[in-house]
């Protein structure tokens, strides 16, 4: 933890001041300054990593006296990936402190254990680490077409790939097959791992896959989706933004389609 003495000696840090899924940005950038320069209470901050040889600090907005201009983490997808991941980490730690205030085992009051970066019960001393929800996300290809779906929450008309939460007792590959079948009515094959991305909205871990169409007629589940269609590379709708693993999946699938044409 960065102390007042550190700040007085002029040590600059990146400051992730968070609230929900929002962070404090100054002129579109994460503040880089001493705690004194920013009028922040260093004793309430927690170091969560380093970037460009500077500490990266997490601080909840509730522990800041002045009014701050907060911005959604989604606005920061263009930031360098190492810094964006630390910002995501701060968001998830902030979410932990706000949603895990009481021990689920005995009902005692939790407090932040700074050494473990976990919430600890003051009564039974149980440690409660940040919750991480495993999700799959998959790009499905059918020859020279890619399957893209639109969710009701995407008011901008954006399309993306299929995603969903992993259920108890299933493998990631089973989850891929189930989610695609439930949301679109089709079956997939040749499921293969692509990569992963922490997704702090609020605490998901996205595990990405590529898959090929196997069978079935496309029938979107309109209780989950607003639309789902097959698209070729020359008639793509607006898609997920750069910096998301959804966009990386789409770009990889398009690259594979061009390579095979």
Swiss-Prot record:
A divalent metal cation 3 binds at residues 179, 183, 224. It comes from the Bacteria. A divalent metal cation 1 binds at residues 163, 183, 224. Zn(2+) binds at residues 103, 106, 121, 124. Keywords: Hydrolase, Magnesium, Manganese, Metal-binding, NAD, Zinc. A motif (Nudix box) lies at residues 164-185. Substrate binds at residues 74, 129, 197-204, 246. A divalent metal cation 2 binds at residue 179. HAMAP family: Nudix_NudC (MF_00297). Homodimer. Belongs to the Nudix hydrolase family. NudC subfamily. This is NAD-capped RNA hydrolase NudC. It comes from Vibrio vulnificus (strain CMCP6). The gene is nudC.
């Amino acid at each position: 933890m960065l102390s007042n003495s550190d700040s007085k000696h002029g040590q600059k840090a990146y400051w992730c001041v968070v609230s929900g899924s929002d962070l404090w940005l100054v002129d579109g950038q994460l503040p880089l300054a001493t705690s004194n320069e920013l009028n922040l209470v260093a004793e309430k901050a927690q170091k969560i990593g380093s970037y460009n040889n500077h500490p990266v600090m997490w601080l909840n907005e509730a522990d800041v006296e002045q009014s701050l201009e907060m911005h959604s983490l989604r606005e920061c997808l263009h930031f360098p990936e190492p810094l964006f991941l630390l910002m995501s980490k701060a968001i998830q730690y902030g979410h932990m402190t706000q949603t895990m205030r009481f021990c689920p085992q005995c009902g005692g009051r939790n407090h932040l254990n700074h050494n473990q970066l976990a919430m600890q019960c003051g009564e039974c001393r149980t440690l409660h680490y940040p919750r991480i929800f495993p999700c799959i996300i998959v790009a499905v290809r059918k020859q020279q077409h890619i399957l893209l779906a639109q969710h009701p929450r995407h008011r901008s008309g954006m399309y993306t790939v299929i995603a969903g939460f992993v259920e108890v007792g299933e493998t990631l590959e089973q989850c891929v097959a189930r989610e695609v079948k439930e949301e679109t009515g089709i079956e997939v094959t040749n499921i293969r791992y692509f990569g992963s991305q922490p997704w702090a909205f609020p605490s998901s871990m996205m595990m990405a896959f590529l898959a090929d169409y196997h069978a079935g007629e496309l029938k979107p589940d309109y209780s989950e989706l607003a639309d789902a269609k097959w698209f070729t590379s020359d008639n793509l709708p607006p898609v997920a933004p750069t910096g998301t693993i959804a966009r990386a999946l789409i770009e990889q699938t398009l690259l594979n389609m061009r390579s095979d044409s």
